[in-house]
A protein has these predicted regions:
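Membrane-proximal intracellular helices of multi-pass ion channels
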Residues: 1-264
Length: 264
């Protein structure tokens, strides 16, 4: 792949742990396409539940993947995001293969919260940047090394909201939430809802605290930069948007702002 044994070893550790640190100042943007392809594969695996991987290995059958609602949701988001990024990055000069590789890399580094820097998506339009901000919250599957909310909680919340809407039209009906053919108990749904309420509350408070700190002790930055910095800190990603984007860093922030982000 063109890397030394030392660099390969370090990148393998930070990929599987979804840590995202690199031995290069430019992160992985200057690595060969072969190296990025290898990192892509293991970022994708790092975002999958290790219990599911173990079951698949023991059964020696891919049926375990097909049975998992969470795996199908996770993979669908990766494919959809990669397709959107490919539509943005594709050009005749780079070639279709390189564009596909870069698109998958960008989606995986965000969804799995690895945080490697590959493309400068800061120059993309507001629609793409908003979508990227949303991906920063998602995270991989439960039981993986990825950070974020985790896809199983997102699925449970979406199905819970769907059931509440159904109850408006069918007030006497009883709706159950299924996950991979298993019915989720009500206590689990309540815990997921509580998690989201606390998560949103912490995000709002963190954004408010960081805004005050930056505007008091540092040079003011955009609201987009503040939002993405809080999202990045809460979900263990690293890069954000705007002033803390993929080719920037947090060096310019004052000590109090860094403490707030560290707590988050």
């Amino acid at each position: 792949s063109g890397l030394t044994l030392f660099d390969s070893f370090n990148h393998s550790l930070t990929t599987l742990s979804t840590g995202g640190f690199s031995t290069f100042n430019s992160s992985v943007s200057n690595l060969s396409q072969q190296s990025k392809l290898i990192i892509n594969v293991f970022m994708y695996l790092a975002g999958i539940s290790f219990i599911l991987l173990l079951r698949t290995f023991k059964s020696r059958s891919l049926k375990e993947f097909y049975k998992s609602t969470e795996f199908k949701f996770y993979t669908s988001i990766v494919l959809m995001s990669s397709a959107l990024f490919f539509a943005k990055t594709y050009s005749i000069s780079t070639g279709i293969g390189e564009s596909i590789n870069d698109a998958f890399f960008t989606s995986l580094t965000l969804i799995t919260t690895t945080g490697f820097t590959n493309l400068n998506y800061e120059n993309w339009n507001i629609n793409y940047r908003t979508y990227i901000l949303g991906l920063m919250f998602l995270g991989g599957m439960a039981g993986s090394t990825a950070g974020g909310i985790k896809t199983i909680r997102v699925i449970a919340l979406l199905k819970s909201v769907r059931n509440e809407i159904r109850k408006i039209f069918y007030p006497n009906a009883i709706f159950k939430i299924r996950m991979s053919k298993s019915i989720l108990p009500e206590k689990m749904i309540e815990s997921v809802q509580t998690f989201f309420i606390l998560y949103v509350a912490i995000f709002v408070l963190g954004t408010f605290a960081l805004s005050i700190s930056i505007n008091t002790f540092s040079d003011p930055i955009s609201f987009e930069g503040i939002l993405s910095a809080v999202a990045s800190a809460m979900n263990n990603i690293g890069p954000g948007l705007s002033e803390v984007g993929p080719v920037e860093n947090y060096y310019f922030l004052d000590s109090s702002s860094k403490i707030i982000l560290s707590i988050l």
